């Protein structure tokens, strides 16, 4: 389809990014990207189930809590709480076009199949992009060495039904938009959704 870009189908160049944004192309996950994501996910699930050793941030806490083991039934809660605790940016709202770029770039990065996420998580990012559900992200605040943890947490809070978004030009609670747009809440599980 001409008006669709298949995320994970190849290199994402500046020219292609510009075309996706300027021509308002819809995003779909390429079949080969789904396979890569699922393969990595399957590995993570297997490793988590079979490993007697702690896996940092997956079966343990973070930072000074790295020696605290997390029970299998609390792994989803750990990931959800991580997103919530890191959503601490402040300042001015980032413009919607930048939010779209952030979603596109994160979906592309996840489509490479190196993170352990669920395919459905990446699909939800594409659903937000395609339906112009724009999470509200603020321009100040950082955590960690990369400095992107706070903005990314704000960007993806709405995937779990928390936080605010712009939808059809109005600021709304994410949970209400998820109900309206038939985009279902992603439930975080082991490692990054």
Question: What are these model-predicted stretches?
Answer:
Residues 183-193:
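Single conserved hydrophobic/aromatic residue that forms the stacking wall/gate
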Residues 54-70, 139-159:
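Conserved phosphate/anionic-ligand binding catalytic regions in large, soluble enzymes, centered on
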Residues 26, 53-56, 101, 134-135, ...:
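Structural motif
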Residues 11-12, 16-19, 23, 68-97, ...:
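Glycine-/small-residue-rich beta-strand-loop submotif within the FAD-binding core of flavoenzymes
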Residues 37, 44-81:
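An N-terminal structural lobe/cap that precedes and organizes the functional/catalytic core
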Residues 1-52:
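N- or domain-start disorder-to-order transition segments that initiate the globular core
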Residues 45-49, 75-137:
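Anion-binding (especially nucleotide phosphate/pyrophosphate-binding) glycine-rich loop
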Residues 5-9, 28-36, 67-74, 90-94, ...:
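Catalytic cores of large soluble enzymes that bind and process phosphate-bearing ligands
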């Amino acid at each position: 389809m001409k008006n669709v870009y298949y995320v994970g189908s190849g290199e994402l160049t500046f020219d292609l990014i510009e075309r996706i944004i300027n021509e308002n192309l819809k995003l779909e996950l390429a079949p080969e990207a789904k396979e890569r994501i699922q393969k990595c996910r399957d590995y993570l699930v297997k490793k988590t189930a079979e490993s007697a050793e702690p896996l940092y941030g997956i079966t343990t806490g973070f930072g000074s809590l790295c020696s605290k083991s997390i029970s299998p039934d609390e792994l989803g809660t750990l990931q959800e709480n991580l997103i919530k605790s890191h959503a601490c940016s402040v300042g001015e709202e980032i413009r919607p076009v930048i939010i779209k770029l952030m979603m596109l770039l994160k979906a592309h990065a996840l489509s490479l199949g190196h993170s352990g996420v669920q395919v459905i998580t990446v699909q939800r990012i594409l659903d937000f992009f395609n339906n112009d559900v724009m999470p509200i992200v603020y321009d100040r605040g950082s955590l960690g060495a990369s400095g992107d943890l706070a903005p990314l947490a704000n960007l993806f809070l709405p995937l779990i039904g928390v936080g605010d978004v712009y939808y059809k030009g109005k600021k709304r609670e994410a949970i209400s938009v998820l109900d309206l747009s038939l985009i279902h809440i992603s439930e975080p599980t082991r490692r990054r959704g």
